């Protein structure tokens, strides 16, 4: 019998035991932002290997690990599960784009050190609301030029859909916490166009 594929996991959140708020997308997203570094610091080696072992016992043979910080790469590489390791890139500020790209390149190079038939370094553009077009262009170009697998979060909620289509709604209010005059970087069509041919 073939193994299952879990194409989108976040092992960096393996330590989550009720820290994140579920239900409303924006409340959940706020709890992720507030807790992600703490959860990532708590999710190391043994805990990640335990979570992978639990997935394998349930019949999962391949995962798509979405990695913000890269700390779970070694555990994934040692676990025996086939891992497409999506190094995530994001950043809404044009002024910080070069720094975000540099940090991504460093993490991506670290993940390449584990490359094997069971560990495939890949790219993830976080989302259209959190990733400046300059960063998206960099990531999609890297994927094209190196024939890398790429992923993204897209249209995960009605809030995001309204934001991308009309530039208004609760997402605009939420994004105003980070930018006093938020405006969408993309329409749904223009975001998808970045991934053409991938």
Describe the role of every protein-language-model region:
Residues 1-4, 9, 56, 61-62:
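N-terminal capping/lid subdomain adjacent to the active-site entrance of alpha/beta enzymes
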Residues 2, 37-38, 125:
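Proline-centered helix-kink/hinge sites
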Residues 3-14, 149-158:
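Histidine-centered catalytic micro-motifs
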Residues 9, 66-67, 85-89, 125-127, ...:
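A cross-domain feature marking catalytic cores of carbohydrate-active enzymes
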Residues 15-46, 84-92, 157-198:
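Active-site gating loops and adjacent loop-to-helix segments of metal-dependent hydrolytic enzymes
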Residues 17-81, 102-116:
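Alpha-helical scaffold segments that flank or form the walls of functional sites
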Residues 71-75, 100-198:
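Histidine/acidic residue-rich metal-binding segments in metalloenzymes
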Residues 93-100:
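Short, charged, surface-exposed secondary-structure boundary motifs
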């Amino acid at each position: 019998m073939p193994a299952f594929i879990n194409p989108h996991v976040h092992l960096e959140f393996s330590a989550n035991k009720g820290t994140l708020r579920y239900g409303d997308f924006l409340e959940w997203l706020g709890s992720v932002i507030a807790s992600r570094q703490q959860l990532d610091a708590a999710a190391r080696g043994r805990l990640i290997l335990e979570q992978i072992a639990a997935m394998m016992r349930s019949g999962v043979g391949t995962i798509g690990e979405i990695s913000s910080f890269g700390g779970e790469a070694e555990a994934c590489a040692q676990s025996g599960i086939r891992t497409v390791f999506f190094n995530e890139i994001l950043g809404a500020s044009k002024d910080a784009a070069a720094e975000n790209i540099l940090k991504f390149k460093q993490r991506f190079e670290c993940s390449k050190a584990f490359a094997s038939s069971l560990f495939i370094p890949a790219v993830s553009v976080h989302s259209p609301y959190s990733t400046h077009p300059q960063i998206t262009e960099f990531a999609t170009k890297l994927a094209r030029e190196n024939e890398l697998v790429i992923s993204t979060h897209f249209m995960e909620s009605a809030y995001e859909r309204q934001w991308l289509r009309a530039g208004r709604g609760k997402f605009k209010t939420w994004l105003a916490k980070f930018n006093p005059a938020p405006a969408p970087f993309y329409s749904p069509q223009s975001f998808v166009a970045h991934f053409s041919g991938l």
